[in-house]
Amino acid sequence: MFNIHSVEIDWGGRPLKLETGKVARQADGAVVATYGETVVLATVVAAKAPREGVDFLPLTVDYQEKAYAAGRIPGGYFKREGRPTEKETLVSRLIDRPIRPLFADGWRNETQVIVTVLSHDMENDPDVLAMVAASAALTLSGVPFKGPIGAARVGFINDEYVLNPVLDEMAETQLELVVAGTADAVLMVESEAKELSEEIMLGAVMFGHRHFQPVIDAIIDLAEKAAKEPRELTVVDDSEIEKEMLGLVEQELRAAYAIPVKQDRYAAVGKVKEKAIAHFFPEGQEPKYDKLRIAGVFKELEAKIVRWNILDTGKRIDGRDSKTVRNILAQVGVLPRTHGSALFTRGETQAMVVTTLGTGEDEQYVDSLSGTYKETFLLHYNFPPYSVGETGRLGGTKRREIGHGKLAWRAIHPVLPPHHEFPYTIRVVSEITESNGSSSMASVCGASLALMDAGVPLKRPTAGIAMGLILEGERFAVLSDILGDEDHLGDMDFKVAGTEAGITSLQMDIKIAGITEEIMKVALGQAKDGRIHILGEMSKALDRARAELGEHAPRIETFKIPTDKIREVIGTGGKVIREIVEKTGAKVNIEDDGTVKVASSDGESIKAAIKWIKSIASDPEVGEIYEGTVVKVMEFGAFVNFFGAKDGLVHISQLAAGRVQKTSDVVKEGDKVKVKLLGFDDRGKTRLSMKVVDQTTGEDLEAKQKAEAKAEGEAPAQAAGE
């Protein structure tokens, strides 16, 4: 029934198995990949005919995690998986980025890659395995894919690189880096680091590249056994069209790409394109070519003109040389009622970034295969259509926005204070108000400034820069702070963020083979120079966190109570804590270990809530004076509520200094009184006194009264002696 083929290797001390021919046999390519006890299924299906009217690769990649993989049932009313989680979206992009450049030019068939997590062993993260499985499925499918690729995760623990660290080891690592590529080239890097040097980061990339070579060999072995016949792809030769078009519009196109202002440049390029279209489609004549084909040739010519200009003259589209960063203006405190805000402008890219501080109630609960956890740092990136001068539909968050937000999150996360030192939930929102390249890195710079403006004590300010590359044969140019056009028309998009001490995040997408270690080394060094320059410009606005939190931010006080007192503070059905919150106006959060966080923008509310909670959770001390309320009057004395929920008896003899005939002569129910704790009787009942406390000032009179009594006792004795 089944025609099963498989390969198995030892990889990083664990078995990796790739199998095909048993599951999903109607897909063009299907591979079940197993690493440890984590299992994923990758499938590839491509349409039989090209999609009409498109000049791009119609590829979609979907990664999905099933709750059953971890022996769990999904939450929610419907008890089934819903829309993609952030993790699923990010891993979908992680798979997409290294495989997309490897499809043959001209492939226009609708292609879908679906990777499903079937089993998760709580040790091996499925994301890298998903990349390997997708690569294997594509290699078997017969679609024109110039792979396979391999992938690996690299950690850095105790000054040593670690291949595919298990989940428990991730808490110790100074680096989490995922790298993917072919046998001879790195194509993609995604990472977060704790201020590591350029040398360590580059070493990690090359370490990962070396160690996923056995995976590539295993995929090739499997393909030799089970790959389908390659699909035919007819490549159209457009060289004659390009030659004719070059002679027609080269000079005008070069002039258009010398215009520094983006909107003016686009208008000029549009006119040149209209001229080219008119030439190839003269009125009244039967067209020889498809319009989409001519538009594609023009697009290729645009790329070549920009690349030639840079390599031949050293001048870029906006007139800069390869190392110059665009003009920067950083401002903080730009919004009056927010907790922290910044406006970061770099050339024609601008980000309005806002920080909001919240309490434990604002933490995000994240449901993942490895369990539910609370996230206290959120960074959201929004890219509205007006930022590029276009109209568009506003709807749900797009994959690109999620990916760019996570990149900025990774850049900032390593420099945040530990949560136990700064117990706030932090949300940063970056609104891209203008965009012409590296808006994600503008978000990093703006986020750093907005956080410091809010009073968040970052280890160091953080900045980011996007690098590009033009490579033609032996000639290359590394570009600092790339424009949008340089991103689209170049060979590499290389984003580096960090502090003056080191790198916190590195993301790399390479579109061609042949990027050597030496080129990456040059790019990292140039990126460091650019990052230090940007940090200097940012410091003109703010160079460290403000000493005080923003005026409108909540204040949080943290203290501990005994765990056996938590129930008393919360009360039956939450009655006591609700009363504390309602009457003081403060937010109260109590954790299982007895940590109490009290938050309010009003300092008096915090003091009142803390006093109330401590009065419940603490034990009263003998000899201390407390304020209380008379709750019951009896013949033999009065019961006073004096320490949270605690009551004690003021005996009639302790009500006042003189003889008291009736308790009600001195106090009545509801009276506010000051009492001193005398101690406890044999039955543990609390003994209080009012007569030894000045009811106006709260002064302890016991010592004074004893001294007076002693003096009165000595006077009669002296008189008797005389």
Curated annotation (Swiss-Prot):
Catalytic reaction equation(s): RNA(n+1) + phosphate = RNA(n) + a ribonucleoside 5'-diphosphate
| First-tier enzyme category under EC | transferase
Which cofactors? Mg(2+)
Keywords, alphabetical: Cytoplasm, Magnesium, Metal-binding, Nucleotidyltransferase, RNA-binding, Transferase
Q: Is Nucleotidyltransferase set as a keyword in this record?
A: yes
Record field: compositional bias (Basic and acidic residues)? 701-713
Question: Which residue intervals make up region (Disordered)?
Answer: 697-722
Record EC number:
2.7.7.8
For the S1 motif domain, which residue ranges apply?
623-691
Extract one GO BP annotation from the record. RNA processing
Q: What cellular-component terms does GO give this entry?
A: cytosol
The molecular function terms in GO held by this entry are: 3'-5'-RNA exonuclease activity; magnesium ion binding; polyribonucleotide nucleotidyltransferase activity; RNA binding
Q: Which Gene3D superfamilies match?
A: GHMP Kinase, N-terminal domain, K Homology domain, type 1, Nucleic acid-binding proteins
Q: Where is the KH domain?
A: 554-613
Q: Does the keyword Calcium apply?
A: no
Q: Where in the cell is it found?
A: Cytoplasm
Return the InterPro entries for the record. Answer: ExoRNase_PH_dom1, ExoRNase_PH_dom2, ExoRNase_PH_dom2_sf, KH_dom, KH_dom_type_1, KH_dom_type_1_sf, NA-bd_OB-fold, PNPase
Residue positions annotated to bind Mg(2+) are 487, 493
HAMAP family named among the record's database cross-references: PNPase
Q: Cross-referenced PANTHER family, in alphabetical order?
A: POLYRIBONUCLEOTIDE NUCLEOTIDYLTRANSFERASE, POLYRIBONUCLEOTIDE NUCLEOTIDYLTRANSFERASE 1, MITOCHONDRIAL
Q: Which family does it belong to?
A: Belongs to the polyribonucleotide nucleotidyltransferase family.
Main function: Involved in mRNA degradation. Catalyzes the phosphorolysis of single-stranded polyribonucleotides processively in the 3'- to 5'-direction.
Q: What is this protein called?
A: Polyribonucleotide nucleotidyltransferase
* Protein source organism: Rhodopseudomonas palustris (strain ATCC BAA-98 / CGA009)
